[in-house]
């Protein structure tokens, strides 16, 4: 058996913190203005009607309403908030 750990083994053993990315509010859910809808890296989802985008590409609701997702093919996937009444 080896009496040394091997050249790489002591330099391994690290991992980064999970970033908790993904969709936070799903289609049909009622949201308040300011609620985070999607956390993402880059524009996997694009902001649609009544949705804003932060510096880190986070999508958030600009008005109170109901979440809607729209797939526009090669134009991308959009997130909208349909206002209540």
Curated annotation (Swiss-Prot):
Q: Does the keyword Ribosomal protein apply?
A: yes
Q: Name one GO molecular function term.
A: structural constituent of ribosome
* GO terms for cellular component: cytosolic large ribosomal subunit
- PROSITE patterns recorded for this chain? RIBOSOMAL_L27
Q: Which GO terms describe its biological process?
A: translation
Keyword terms: Ribonucleoprotein, Ribosomal protein
Q: Where is this region: Disordered?
A: 1-21
Signal peptide residues are none
A Pfam family annotated for this chain is Ribosomal_L27
In the record, the note on similarity to other proteins reads:
Belongs to the bacterial ribosomal protein bL27 family.
Query: What is the protein's name according to its record?
Result: Large ribosomal subunit protein bL27
């Amino acid at each position: 058996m080896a009496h040394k750990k091997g050249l790489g083994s002591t330099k391994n053993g690290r991992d980064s913190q999970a970033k908790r990315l993904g969709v936070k509010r799903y289609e049909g859910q009622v949201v308040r203005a300011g609620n985070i809808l999607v956390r993402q890296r880059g524009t996997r989802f694009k902001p649609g009607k009544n949705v804003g985008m932060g510096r880190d590409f986070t999508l958030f609701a600009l008005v109170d309403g109901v979440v809607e997702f729209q797939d526009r093919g090669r134009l991308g996937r959009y997130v909208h908030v349909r206002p209540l009444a």
